[in-house]
């Protein structure tokens, strides 16, 4: 009795239909040429952490709830006197998601979190970097259902970067559109 391994919904959708759609659209000769999701990087800068070290730890705990894996606290590299910032002071946190956790996060982002954003009109289609990666910013991290605002009491913004193996923005846009990213028209 062999057990079947768990496959995230979006990964199965990519394997079954999206890969063939992209192959037909762009005329790839090899399966490995088809763009795929590589990683998702979540970054949260916490400005209040300059005065209170616990804010960065609290942000890292919230990000761990959102991402499903432990967040790494980021530290300042240089001192900036106008911001009262010293070197090696905690200023935020980040997480890099790959494989199954990446697909699960993107599924929750598209189906649950983005519809909860106030006055959401779609994602900016111009936020590609020229090499097939897409970045978006979220003003409040409390749009994720894992975060209880009553317990947190704080609301921070976060950056989400979706890295793909696509060589051009058009290929990456086609890939993310196939994953039902809600781009503005």
From Swiss-Prot:
InterPro entries in alphabetical order: Ribosomal_uL5, Ribosomal_uL5_bac-type, Ribosomal_uL5_C, Ribosomal_uL5_CS, Ribosomal_uL5_dom_sf, Ribosomal_uL5_N
This protein's record includes keyword Metal-binding: no
Source taxon at top rank: Bacteria
GO terms classed as biological process: translation
Family matches, as Gene3D superfamilies: 3.30.1440.10
GO MF annotation: an example: structural constituent of ribosome
Cellular component GO terms held in the UniProt record: ribonucleoprotein complex; ribosome
Entry keyword set: Ribonucleoprotein, Ribosomal protein, RNA-binding, rRNA-binding, tRNA-binding
PANTHER family named among the record's database cross-references: 60S RIBOSOMAL PROTEIN L11-RELATED
Entry function: This is one of the proteins that bind and probably mediate the attachment of the 5S RNA into the large ribosomal subunit, where it forms part of the central protuberance. In the 70S ribosome it contacts protein S13 of the 30S subunit (bridge B1b), connecting the 2 subunits; this bridge is implicated in subunit movement. Contacts the P site tRNA; the 5S rRNA and some of its associated proteins might help stabilize positioning of ribosome-bound tRNAs.
Stated family: Belongs to the universal ribosomal protein uL5 family.
Complex and partners: Part of the 50S ribosomal subunit; part of the 5S rRNA/L5/L18/L25 subcomplex. Contacts the 5S rRNA and the P site tRNA. Forms a bridge to the 30S subunit in the 70S ribosome.
Protein name (database record): Large ribosomal subunit protein uL5
Lineage per the UniProt record: Bacteria, Pseudomonadati, Pseudomonadota, Alphaproteobacteria, Hyphomicrobiales
């Amino acid at each position: 009795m062999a057990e079947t391994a768990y496959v995230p919904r979006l990964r199965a959708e990519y394997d079954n239909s999206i890969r063939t759609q992209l192959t037909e659209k762009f005329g790839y000769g090899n399966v490995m040429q088809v763009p795929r999701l590589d990683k998702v990087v979540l970054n949260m800068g916490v400005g209040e952490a300059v005065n209170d070290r616990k804010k960065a730890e609290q942000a890292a705990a919230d990000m761990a709830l959102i991402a499903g894996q432990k967040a790494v606290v980021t530290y300042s590299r240089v001192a900036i006197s106008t911001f009262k910032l010293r070197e090696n002071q905690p200023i935020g946190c980040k997480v890099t998601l790959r494989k199954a956790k990446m697909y699960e996060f993107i599924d929750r982002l598209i189906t649950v979190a983005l519809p909860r954003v106030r006055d959401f009109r779609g994602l900016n289609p111009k936020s590609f970097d020229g090499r097939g990666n897409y970045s978006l910013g979220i003003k409040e991290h409390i749009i994720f259902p894992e975060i209880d605002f009553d317990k947190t009491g704080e609301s921070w913004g976060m950056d989400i970067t979706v890295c793909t193996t696509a060589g051009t923005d058009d290929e990456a846009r086609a890939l993310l559109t196939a994953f039902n990213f809600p781009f503005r028209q």
